[in-house]
Amino acid sequence: HRSAETAALPNWAVWKDEAFGTSYEPAAIVYNKRLLPAEKVPDTHAALIALLDEQPAQLRGRIATYDPERSGLGLLLHSQDAQANPIVFWQLARGMGQLGLEQHATSSDMLDRVAAGKLVLAYNVLGSYASKRAQRDPVLGVIWPQDYTLVLSRVAFITRGARHPAAARLWLDHLLSTRGQALLAGHLGLLPVRGDAGTADSAAALLHHNLQHAFRPIRIGSGLLAYQDQAKKQGFLRQWAAATRPLP
């Protein structure tokens, strides 16, 4: 579908006029402010690795992330994380695993456990969920890593067998328009892909400004399907399981 609205989208959010990013979702680190003092809060992946090394007693059994075996989103985030910085990612995976890493299927589960004080922090949590929860629960802190913050997007496309393709094209154009994007932000609290869909002090604009060079979008394309290959998927899961195995 050749939409006139795609000219306003970033290059990473469009693939062959077939798939379109509609909103973006940064991956955050969430922590309990009562359990982790401000001077210990890590602002990069390296700082998080250092924290794991320095505070093993405090963090043992009290850190979490997605389970890539139960969560397709977790598989996407972890595999893209491994591509973004393989040395740091696998070092982090081993560090978390040695301390008894909890693995969950949803961001909501992790946020609940961090807020309740059962976890000190959770890694690779969906950013919009974390920010929205932190607004009403002041015990939660949200970190956007300043070395790189992975950003994924919600993707819309028209299937080849769509029963009403003309209506689908109209809906997609609306979804990608300035008004449609503003509605996503205002009514659903999502971060619109279009830079002109909000004000200069909108959540999306402020986040993009704060991240600047650390903003690391996951490009929409055929590469996202790589782990649909079962051999590749199982290879990654085996490597993940080995890296996150707790110390005896």
Model-derived regions: residue spans:
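Mature extracytoplasmic/periplasmic domains
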Residues: 159-220
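Short, hydrophobic alpha-helical packing/hinge segments within bilobed ligand-binding/sensory domains
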Residues: 110-111, 129, 168, 181
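Ligand-binding "clamshell"
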Residues: 7-16, 132-144, 206-207
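A bilobed periplasmic-binding-protein/Venus flytrap-type ligand-binding module shared by bacterial periplasmic
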Residues: 28-35, 77-79, 153-164, 183
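Conserved C-terminal helix/tail region of periplasmic/extracytoplasmic solute-binding proteins
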Residues: 217-248
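Periplasmic-binding protein-like
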Residues: 25, 91-97, 103, 136-160
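A ligand-binding cleft/hinge motif common to bilobed small-molecule-binding domains
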Residues: 115, 121-139
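Extracytoplasmic ligand-binding site segments that recognize negatively charged/polar headgroups
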Residues: 1-115
